[in-house]
Amino acid sequence: MNETGSIGIIETKYAEFKELILNNGSVLSPVVIAYETYGTLSSSKNNAILICHALSGDAHAAGYHSGSDKKPGWWDDYIGPGKSFDTNQYFIICSNVIGGCKGSSGPLSIHPETSTPYGSRFPFVSIQDMVKAQKLLVESLGIEKLFCVAGGSMGGMQALEWSIAYPNSLSNCIVMASTAEHSAMQIAFNEVGRQAILSDPNWKNGLYDENSPRKGLALARMVGHITYLSDDKMREKFGRNPPRGNILSTDFAVGSYLIYQGESFVDRFDANSYIYVTKALDHYSLGKGKELTAALSNATCRFLVVSYSSDWLYPPAQSREIVKSLEAADKRVFYVELQSGEGHDSFLLKNPKQIEILKGFLENPN
């Protein structure tokens, strides 16, 4: 554990609610939400910021869970004393999405009627449902209006949804490396990942036991991880170099890297959750052009939209489309395209320019 600039040891908390009526009419009961908080809520409760995570993220956005942790939370470079999301000024909340597998209600949760994990019996969850659950959590903390909702990738979709579903519940919205709806290509990559899981002999219609479809999930992660990097970054990192070690498994270093990413992912994620969350991504749509402008028309908050030059999963054009529609709807929006060779994952990585942009947006509300 390296405490330099960190907020230190953090405990994951759990909030339970009686029920949540989902968009499709299903009732999820009870509902558990895993979350973490950083900083102190002001007496007027006007300094709260909600951070929304991406597909494979969780509630652990900053700090450490124990002194033996080797790595801090996934956005520790941006959350903490004096950082972009300054815990000396703001009360930061990050929760695991429902449908996920890091403590919130999802396929791994115990079905109250069977006393066994839901598995594929868990109801379909949408981005809208994820946001509904977050709203329950925020209200339970006594917060009527968030100072900001921020997120990258899938987290950016959640932030967008907050702005239109609860327009009077946030003052600022930060959308990074995201989109208002998936293109056919983006859906295609997710479908390949899902099919890899479904074709695993251990899938068992989503009602698997401890012998889970690890091979299928690893392949899904390998496919997904390709889209998180850029061509330049892969060329720089791997080129056409041979792998180290067993050359029978793969001919190139990039293949060895992807195999490692897949194998390590299955130890921290659930195959059902991967299917549920990617389907939520694919089904989310605010439309295009006039339809998108209309969808954003009731938003009242200020927006910051950030894209990355080398992001080919959610390319800058999709961010510019959001910006164009916000401007057409006469909303206050600031747009930045950061030059980065890191691909889609750029929003997760430490970048002095990004730190400056986020901090400046939050500290200068006018």
Swiss-Prot record:
Its EC number(s): 2.3.1.31
Compartment list: Cytoplasm
InterPro entries: AB_hydrolase_1 (IPR000073), AB_hydrolase_fold (IPR029058), HAT_MetX-like (IPR008220)
Binding annotation for substrate: R221, D345
Any Pfam family the entry gives: Abhydrolase_1
GO cellular component, one term: cytoplasm
Swiss-Prot/TrEMBL keywords: Acyltransferase, Amino-acid biosynthesis, Cytoplasm, Methionine biosynthesis, Transferase
Similarity-based family: Belongs to the AB hydrolase superfamily. MetX family.
Subunit-level organization: Homodimer.
Name by which UniProt lists this protein: Homoserine O-acetyltransferase
Source species of the chain: Leptospira interrogans serogroup Icterohaemorrhagiae serovar Lai (strain 56601)
UniProt lineage: Bacteria, Pseudomonadati, Spirochaetota, Spirochaetia, Leptospirales
